[in-house]
A protein has these predicted regions:
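Conserved pre-catalytic core of RNA-dependent polymerases
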Residues: 1-156, 160, 582, 642, ...
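Short Cys/His-based metal-binding microdomains
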Residues: 593-649
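Basic, alpha-helical interaction scaffolds
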Residues: 236-307, 358-365
């Protein structure tokens, strides 16, 4: 497979191994056993191929080290190591010794040896195979076991670097950090050029042991902190002001950072849209393209970087223009809702940005050390570190210089205010409480917390100042005086003194009640936050409300009608058409005349009455005759009479089980619509031809999706006729 670099050079190609099924299954079994212990043996600095770890943590660590060194005005260097053909060059003996070093037993090691002993391969190029040749190094890309073997081998290098006292890292608070990894991508944080020299010497020795060779043409270095204006280029390395790694462009230049991480991707999305606009996609087809191809280009960036509001607006405009080719037909707040409420399940970008940021709470309170965790503790040091998230704070009272983490604090506070249905324990916490201030500033006294004085009732308002102070001192309060104690008690407003306190909630102070549910950010993922946030923003569509009003239906009936869109047909165009009917976004002459697109609003068929949706599909004399013929057609097919009201025609028979009648009704409306566009009256003979054609289409899709049995059951009446 060719990489994005210059295709004229062989080193820019990578091989994907085609492995026989038996070997692949056996390899997968061994891989499954190794993955069970990876979290224990692989340091949290490695974010690649270890379950539960996120690549964005490595990217965020690099950004935070850059910010920290700049704020503290301390020198630093980022070294981005690129290994030449890393997966293809690792030495097998070294790999097996690494497994032994980490305590894997002889049985598992023998299995790995079995996969690599007497290994031969050939190259398939343009359908032509070379003769087989013996392999002597490397792990096969395409083998389930390969990534785990590689990161175990790479961990030996990381352990060596972390243990070397002469190779210094960047100190953030009291913690020293030297590196982050993502599979074979290694980024090092060092304070000076001497450490870079030591690392390069170590890497040369590591090459001899492991076979992994540094690619000096792609390895980059970057001056950071107080050295960021340095223009020197020592040691023959590529020194850059702007480096791309881990899917993110790292630079101190804000303009370049926005352009390369956001607006360049916007150009790619525009190009993709131009290509897909030529394909004549259905509405649901476009939704699929948006969710599976266009937005994934940005979702990772949203989770790692601060996203400008202007960019979100531009991206929304591009996406909705692609979807509707003009003015929105469904309100955006309805479009992001679930199909059962008349929505399209589109991703709400603003909500996704917030949910992906809130998902960092789970990572903050998980185990392990990382530069980004140390950085946020440093930022919140005056407020007790991450303890602040448990408090009833106001972001305005917290001087947090990082926009990324300030937004996290703001959105977490907003989430609790919006969704908490009863006061949480945070309202009772004294410290950093926006309602408890001295000299118009919130308070945080670590010595009080060490003495167990955390909640308002711990200030003992059932006693006077002197009695309560003496009681607190007897329970361990140190390094405080009576005036400070009295000041804290006086700062508590009367309405907070009467709040009910459930001290057991201190076991998980971040948790709050949302109706009958408990929301605990420590276990919540991006998906959970998104569902919660979008539930408050999403609205029921206008089409949903109109169906209720026009036909006097209950919410459950309208929901059922919209959900049947997913099963009415396997063909996206038919599904999309039925959705448009239900959503009242089909443009008949009556609607076109109202917006000034046509002068004559009369029916295309009868030229007498205004062409409303109801008239076109049911009330017109031409359409009415077609439905009579349709009922005869259905009787001949099924032997059953069917009555068709306006509701039945527009939304289908809600109690129909097999789905064939509803499918025929939808295709019949499709036939009426296409006849209108051709200025021809709907005709039962032409409809039968359409059904025969659609039968072939549905059968083809069923074969492709391996759903022939379901297809046969639905179409039995038609097949037997």
């Amino acid at each position: 497979m060719k990489r994005k670099e210059d295709r004229n050079y062989l080193e820019n190609c990578k091989a994907i191994s085609l492995i026989n099924a038996d070997a692949k299954h056996a390899s997968k079994v061994i891989a499954g056993r190794i993955t069970k212990v990876l979290q224990e043996i692989i340091h949290t600095n490695q974010t690649g191929y270890v379950k539960g770890r996120f690549t964005g943590e490595a990217a965020r660590s690099i950004i935070d080290v850059m910010e920290y060194t700049k704020q503290q005005n301390i020198p630093g260097i980022l070294l981005f190591i690129d290994f030449e053909k890393a997966f293809d060059s690792i030495d097998w003996n070294f790999m097996l010794k690494c497994l032994d070093a980490f305590g894997f037993g002889p049985t598992l090691i023998r299995w790995v040896e079995t996969f690599y002993n007497d290994l031969t391969s050939c190259v398939l190029n343009n359908g032509i195979c070379t003769s087989y040749f013996e392999l002597q190094r490397g792990v096969r890309q395409g083998d389930p076991l390969s990534p785990y073997l590689f990161i175990i081998a790479a961990e030996i290098l990381a352990v060596t670097i972390r243990s070397r006292q002469d190779i210094q890292g960047i100190m953030i608070g009291q913690e020293e950090f030297k590196l982050v990894q993502y599979a074979d991508d290694l980024t090092l944080f060092v304070p000076n050029i001497e450490c870079v020299e030591l690392i390069l010497q170590l890497l040369d020795r590591f090459t001899i042991c492991s076979g992994l060779k540094v690619n000096h043409t792609k390895t980059e270095a970057m001056w950071i902190g107080s050295c960021r204006q340095n223009t020197a280029t020592p040691l023959g390395l590529r020194w850059s002001k702007c480096v791309k790694a881990l899917g993110i462009v790292f630079t101190y230049n804000d303009t370049d950072q926005l352009q390369k991480n956001f607006y360049d991707k916007l150009k790619d999305i525009r190009i993709q849209i131009r290509l897909w606009n030529c394909r004549g996609l259905s509405l649901f087809g476009k939704v699929t393209i948006i969710k599976s191809l266009l937005l994934p280009k940005m979702l990772y960036v949203f989770s790692v970087l601060t996203t400008p509001e202007e960019f979100i607006k531009q991206l929304n405009t591009i996406i909705y223009n692609f979807l509707w080719k003009g003015t929105d037909k469904i309100a955006r707040k309805a479009a992001v809702n679930d199909l059962k409420y008349g929505g399209l399940n589109l991703i709400d970008l603003e909500t996704y940005v917030k949910s992906s940021r809130l998902a960092w709470l789970n990572r903050i309170f998980s185990g392990g050390s990382s530069p980004w965790k140390a950085y946020i503790k440093y930022l919140l040091e005056d407020f007790g570190g991450v303890f602040l998230f448990s408090c009833n704070y106001d972001v305005k009272d917290c001087k947090v210089t990082s926009t990324f983490y300030r937004e996290l604090l703001q959105w977490w506070a907003d989430l609790r205010i919006t969704f908490s249905t009863r006061p949480s324990i945070s309202y009772n916490i004294i410290w950093n409480n926006k309602d408890i201030k001295i000299d118009n500033k919130t308070i945080y006294y670590s010595n009080y917390i060490k003495a167990g004085i955390l909640l308002i009732n711990h200030l003992q308002f059932n006693k006077n100042n002197i009695e309560s102070f003496n009681s607190a001192k007897s329970k361990g309060l140190k390094h405080s005086n009576f005036l400070v104690w009295s000041g804290v008690r006086a700062a508590v407003p009367a309405h907070l003194k009467s709040l009910d306190v459930i001290e057991s909630e201190l076991e998980c102070p971040l948790e709050f009640h949302c109706g009958e549910k408990k929301i605990n950010p420590i276990v919540c993922k991006n998906k959970h936050f998104y569902e919660l946030l979008v539930s408050d923003k999403a609205k029921v569509s206008r089409g949903f409300a109109k169906l209720k009003e026009d036909f006097g239906l209950a919410d459950s009936a309208v929901t059922k009608a919209f959900l049947k869109v997913k099963t009415v047909s396997s063909e996206m165009f038919i599904r999309s058409f039925q959705f448009k009917i239900l959503s009242d976004i089909t443009f008949t002459n009556s609607r076109l005349a109202k917006i000034g697109y046509v002068q004559d609003d009369s029916c295309t068929f009868c030229r007498v009455s205004p062409e409303t949706v109801n008239h076109l599909f049911y009330e017109c004399t031409h359409t009415n005759q077609f439905w009579k013929d349709f009922k005869n057609f259905w009787f001949a097919l099924s032997g059953k009479h069917v009555e068709l009201s306006l509701q039945d025609v527009m939304i289908g028979k809600l109690d129909e089980v097999s789905g064939l009648l509803n499918y025929f009704l939808t295709v019949a409306k499709w036939h009426i619509w296409t006849s209108r566009k051709r200025c021809l009256s709907p005709d039962i003979a032409a409809f039968k031809e359409v059904i025969n054609m659609k039968y072939k289409t549905e059968k083809y899709i069923a074969v492709k999706n391996n759903t022939q049995r379901k297809f046969q059951a639905r179409w039995k009446l038609f097949i037997d006729s």
